[in-house]
Amino acid sequence: RSSDGRGIWVGQKRFSGKLNLFVLDSEILVVNVLGIEKYLSSVVGSEMPTKWPIEALKAQAIASRTYALKQKGNNLFDIDSTQKNQVYNGLESRTYKTIRAVKSTRSLVLTYKNKLINALFHSSSGGMTENSQDVWKNKYPYLSSVKDFDKNNPKFRWQKKFSSNELTNLFPKIGGL
């Protein structure tokens, strides 16, 4: 824990709160330990442009809070700081607007039948989302297919090419595609 109010630098990122360090496979894993509201004020700024309207930031704060609280975590940390879970870039992503969005939605979460939902979100759906049961084994009534409203998104259409060897490595149980 640093007594410096400006935070603790790790590489190019600055963090508040406490840092726990673990050695895993000859690499150092840095885990930032802090309260959820401080965490969220950075997540909101990491997941979306902070110049967007405050109501959009508030919606992101609620979705991100729900998502974070729903995660089970592991014995080292609760949630990954990448797109695997939610992007968390430390203090550099925290702004007055993200702090305001998080404070004004404090404790608000998304529920279905009085339980936290699996509040998944994305930066781009590529035109349409899928029904949950078509992607995962579980059917969530609140995760149903809808068309994307934002055809101007630069990631609306994309492509990725794979070689036969890459597909075989990605899908070894079925010998590729």
Residue ranges of model-derived segments:
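Conserved, single-site charged/polar hotspot
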Residues: 1-177
